[in-house]
């Protein structure tokens, strides 16, 4: 499994709140946020971190990432405002067409069973899957900074970033930040389509 973590965003809300470190390097419960994210995927070591070149130059981000995942590859890209899909396209040359891929956000935590998730998607021979949740979660009382999924019988119909499909967002599935693809070529094909639409 290749885990790709786009983490090249500026993190404007955190800067505005007074944080000095880039969001993935903020310490929560004695670990960086990015270490918590990596711990969501036990025994996985094939990582690509797509990072903002300024964060790599001006912080110890590279050393921290290499300490967490020594065999990881780090891709440095210029500051942009095109989002995580764009960032992942900058690592296409490191993705094999036939390997399984998870694209993971760099700034979340979740309680889940990774082994069960993998077993489920592999048994169903799913081309893709998104780990989602719904119901009351305290963070839902605030902003809509989540990707909401429209589904029918647990099959994804549509996903929308930062905007729920209905007025009752707590009854909708929201992505936790984990996107599974059975083949790397699916990542390349569909991420390119998204970028070409913009």
Model-found features: residue ranges?
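Active-site glycine-centered loops adjacent to acidic/histidine catalytic or metal-binding residues
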Residues: 9, 107, 134
């Amino acid at each position: 499994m290749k885990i790709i973590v786009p983490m090249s965003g500026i993190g404007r809300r955190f800067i505005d709140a007074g944080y000095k470190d880039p969001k993935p390097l903020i310490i929560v419960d004695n670990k960086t946020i990015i270490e918590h994210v990596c711990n969501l995927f036990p025994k996985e070591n094939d990582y690509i971190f797509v990072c903002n070149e300024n964060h790599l130059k001006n912080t110890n981000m590279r050393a921290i990432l290499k300490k967490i995942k020594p065999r990881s590859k780090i891709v440095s890209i210029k500051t942009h405002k095109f989002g995580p899909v764009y960032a992942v396209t900058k690592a296409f040359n490191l993705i094999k067409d036939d390997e399984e891929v998870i694209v993971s956000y760099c700034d979340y935590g979740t309680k889940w069973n990774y082994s069960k998730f993998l077993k489920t998607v592999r048994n169903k021979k799913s081309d893709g899957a998104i780990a989602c949740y719904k119901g009351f979660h305290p963070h839902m009382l605030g902003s809509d900074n989540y990707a909401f999924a429209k589904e029918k019988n647990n099959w994804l119909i549509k996903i929308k970033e930062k905007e729920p499909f209905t007025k009752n967002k707590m009854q909708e599935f929201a992505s936790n930040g984990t996107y599974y693809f059975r083949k790397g070529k699916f990542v390349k094909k569909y991420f390119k389509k998204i970028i070409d639409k913009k």
